[in-house]
Amino acid sequence: MMAEFHYGGQAVIEGVMMRGRRHMTTVVRRPDGELTEDTQTLPSLYTGRLRTLPLLRGIVVLIEALVLGVKILMYSANVSLEEEGEKVEGWLVWVTLAFSLVAAVAVFFVAPLFITNQINVESNVLFHVIEGVIRLAIFIVYLELISLLPDIKRVFAYHGAEHKTVNAYEAGVPLEVEAVKEYSKAHVRCGSSFIFTVLVLAIIVFSLVGIAEPTFWMMLLARILLVPVIAALGYEVIYFGARHAGNRLVRAILAPGLWLQSMTTREPDDGQIEVAIAALSRVLEAEESEEAPAEAAT
C-alpha cells in the first residue's frame, strides 16, 4: 500500500512551485499578467528509496531544496525579466548560491560562536544556550530586514498563498480562490518551522560536542561539519510533527516555528492565490496522468 503523500511547495519571484510525488510544477505570473508554467519529472534521487529512510531523507530533502530551489528561482527570475529583454545566467545563480551558503554558515554558525567565546562563561550548557539565543536573534533580525524589501514582501505573500492552497487541498475543499483564501497562511511543514527547529536542535547537539571541551577551532569545525546532521534531525522532527499535528503536545512544541511563519508569510491577494492554485492543480494533473496508464494496464 502506497504511503500518503503530502504536497508542498515554495514561493518564487512572482510565482509558486508545487511538488508532487514524482513531478513539480512552477507557475509564474508574467509582466503582462498571463500565467506561464513549467512542469518537470523529478530526478530519481528525490523520489527513490533514499527519500524514505529516516535521517538520510532529511539530507536528500536539503539537497533537493538547494538544487531545485536554484533552478526554479532562475526560471521565475527569467520570466519576470522577459519584458526587459534580460536573462539571468545559470553560472551567476550557482555562484550566488555558493556565496550565500558560505555567508549563511559564517553569519548563523561562526559569528554566534565567536561572540559567545568573548564572554566568560564556564558552564558548557549555558555557553551553548547563549550561543543559540544569539543565533536565533541574528536570524530574526535578518528576516525583519529583508521583509522591508518590496520584492521580498511579494515573495512572502506568494508563500502565504502556497500555504493556504495546500491547507485547502488537505481539507478537501474545491481549489477555488474564494474557498482557499479562508484558510491559514501557516503550515506545520513549512521551511520556516524547519529552520527554527534546526536552530533549537543546534543548541542540544553543540552542547553534547562541548562536553569533550574542544578548542575554539575544533568547535568551529564541528559547527560546519554537523550542519547536515542537524538538518537531518530537524527534518525528522518536522516529519513527526506533521503526522501528529492533532496532538496538543506536538502542536505546543511546533508553536514557535508556526509563530516564525508570521514573519515569512503575508496575506496574499486573489491573483497570488490563483497562481498557487494553478501550480497545485497542474502538478496533480501530472501525477494523475502518470498513474492512469498503469491502472489501465492492470
Please report, for each region that a protein language model flagged, where it lies by residue.
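Divalent-cation
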Residues: M1-M74
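Polar-ligand-bearing catalytic/cofactor-coordination segments
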Residues: A3-M18, T26, D32, V129-I134, ...
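Multi-pass alpha-helical transmembrane bundle typical of ion/small-solute transporters
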Residues: P43, R49, L62, L66-W91, ...
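A transmembrane-helix-recognition feature enriched in membrane-embedded lipid enzymes
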Residues: P54-S80, F240, H244-M263
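Juxtamembrane "helix exit" motif at the C-terminal ends of alpha-helical transmembrane segments
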Residues: K71-V79, S100-S123, V198-A222, P228-A231, ...
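Hydrophobic alpha-helical segments characteristic of transmembrane helices
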Residues: A77-S123, F127-L149
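Membrane interface segments of multi-pass transport proteins and intramembrane proteases
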Residues: S80-K87, F114-I130, G210-L221, F240-R251, ...
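Alpha-helical transmembrane segments of multi-pass membrane proteins, especially transporters
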Residues: L97, L101, F127, E131, ...
